[in-house]
Regions:
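Substrate/ligand-engaging "lid" and interaction regions
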Residues: 1-341
Length: 341
């Protein structure tokens, strides 16, 4: 908490993946699960929400200096979600401090576009017996948009190639619905076909054509165009970036937490669908996810199903009849009308 409390700290950036927010999509509030309850009871802190909340509580007591908390995760309105879970948490401890956070701490929404695989031991670390815990491996491409009207934040970040915009929604949409949705689709499709890495599955002509048609026919038509931004060119660049074999981006990593990612990346597009489109590709992607849960793949490649809902999902797909229907009826994932089902 010392860094959060220090009045010299002006900006904190957050990158923890979607599940690190403990946000209940259905109720639009903090998910009071076992880890959050643990943190509220002041046991050994387990969550980002706990660390950040207690740090801001101490900052309130020490100096009440302004601070920017910047989420860099793949969530629509990520800053609003982070602010909501933190204020929900703190309000259970001290409502006055929660009000200060609500009014004074800034949580801008952002879109960060740079593929960053999970970094474990790299070959040279093994060979040279060298370890760097701060190492981040990523692709050369990067884009960072921040929704912001404050000149103060711009002054803090003046030497960075950050694009400040009045409304982040368009940039969120293209990242989530084109890049992230394609990543998830390729993960489930690729694992079923026995591939391990993104560059392998995108190099399969059938898989490339599938994703390309999915984006052209079912995704891009739902995105409202802005200025002179070329959505087709962005799509082509994304698919080209996926071919970078140096990243060694594991499909198993991308396939994690599907119950959180699918509503945001895949289903949200379907809910805003064009009435003249049948959405065959979207249906196939969801079917691939269900088969992924059943560990059905043609090369018998073994992978782990890591998901906060894994117990419930695996029980449905492995032990219950009409399992696809039961999964589609899970409101916290699909939340579909009868017409959309």
């Amino acid at each position: 908490c010392n860094l959060i409390t220090n009045k010299e700290t002006k900006i904190i950036t957050i990158t923890v993946t979607e599940k690190g927010y403990h946000y209940n999509l259905e109720n639009k509030c903090l998910d009071l699960n076992a880890d959050i309850i643990n943190d509220l009871e002041k046991n050994k802190i387990k969550t980002l929400v706990g660390y950040l909340s207690y740090g801001l509580i101490e900052r309130f007591k020490e100096n009440k200096e302004d601070i920017y908390i910047i989420s860099c995760d793949n969530l629509s309105r990520n800053g609003d979600i982070l602010k909501k879970v933190v204020t929900d948490f703190v309000s259970r401890i001290n409502k006055n401090i929660a009000l200060w956070i609500e009014e004074s701490v800034k949580f801008p929404c952002t879109m960060v576009d740079c593929i960053v695989p999970n970094t474990k031991k790299l070959p040279y670390e093994v060979k040279e017996k060298f370890k760097d815990n701060s190492l981040v491996l990523c692709e050369p491409y990067r884009d960072w948009y921040i929704e912001n009207k404050s000149e103060l934040l711009k002054s803090y970040l003046v030497h960075n190639k950050i694009k400040f915009v009045n409304n982040i929604e368009f940039y969120e949409n293209i990242k989530l619905k084109i890049l992230n949705a394609s990543h998830s689709a390729l993960a489930y499709l690729g694992l079923l076909l026995g591939y391990k890495y993104v560059h392998e599955v995108i190099s399969d002509e059938l898989c490339y054509n599938f994703i390309n048609k999915y984006l052209d026919r079912e995704v891009i038509p739902t995105i409202q165009k802005q200025d002179n931004f070329d959505l087709v060119q962005y799509k082509n660049n994304v698919l080209r970036r996926f071919r970078n074999h140096f990243l060694q981006h594991k499909l198993e990593q991308i396939g994690m937490d599907g119950s959180i990612k699918i509503p945001i990346r895949i289903i949200d597009t379907f809910k805003n669908k064009n009435q003249n489109t049948e959405y065959v590709y979207t249906s196939i992607i969801v079917a691939c996810w269900v088969l992924f849960l059943k560990k059905t793949n043609i090369k018998k490649y073994n992978y782990d199903v890591s998901d906060p809902m894994s117990d419930e999902l695996l029980n449905i797909v492995n032990n219950q009849k009409n399992n696809v229907e039961k999964i589609i009826n899970l409101k916290n994932i699909f939340d579909l009308s009868e017409e959309h089902k």
